Amino acid sequence: MFSFVLVFIVPLSNLLSNEFYKGDALVKEGVYAFYNYDFDKAVQVLDEARGIYPEHPGVHFIWAAARWVRAQANSPVDETYKILENDLQTILPIYDALVLKFDYDPMYKLYRGSAVGLTARVSLGKKQWLRTLYRAYKGFVIINDVAIDYPDLADSQLPIGIVEYYSAISNRLLKFAAGFYDLNPSKDSGLQKISVSADRGTWSWIESKAILSNLYLWVEDEPILAVDYTKSLVQNFPNNFYFNLLYLEDDATAFSSLLASSNI
């Protein structure tokens, strides 16, 4: 549901209980409200966090994404893109400045790439196809550079894993394009990278687990592997209807698989 930009962004996620960046706890509160479908509270909390902790690496991007999703629930489609476009125009100069100030910290570059990539969604909404491709490419290059330079940064593995997985099941042109960026167009490699993000990502574990749940349930036909991921999502976000529905589907399908394999 919330993987609205897939390749182009580092999705929203949980922050660890021990703050690494000042403001982690407040941003976490906003993120949890977001994934529990309390969008008004999420935007309110993230507004506050932006004011108090303007140098937090994720708060500006998460704020823009939360405002866009809230708009999708309450506003006409054209208005949602105007909101997203205006918010991105607001935060991109902020990220440009933060990357310069904290050039030693890859998280700022990662979120800058995410914000640049999200501009592709605005172009897509306007049916500007070439601009969509260009902006998506521009954002992905930034994210891919971070993943290459900082291979231990688990959060960067999600978008790379998505590209590798989907290029493996797509046409030759997409496979060639993935190889051009030194990516491995392989389902196994893609799943492994997404799993790293799900298990170790500070920011990306929520979307990573949701994506793995869908892939194992509907594409890989391995529902048993999906259950643990969806169970974790439901435990953390009990008010998220989509996660609850996904968990029920995973659990029921996994149970049916077990019965079938046992010849019961």
List each model region and its residues.
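Solenoid-like repeat scaffolds
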Residues: 49-54, 149, 179-184, 198-202, ...
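Glycine- and aromatic-enriched membrane insertion/assembly motifs of diderm outer-membrane
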Residues: 52-58, 66-69
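Acidic, serine/threonine- and glycine-rich low-complexity intrinsically disordered segments
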Residues: 217-241
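Alpha-helix capping and inter-helical loop/turn segments
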Residues: 169, 217-221, 252-256
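A beta-strand-loop signature enriched in Asp, Gly, Thr, and Trp
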Residues: 241-264
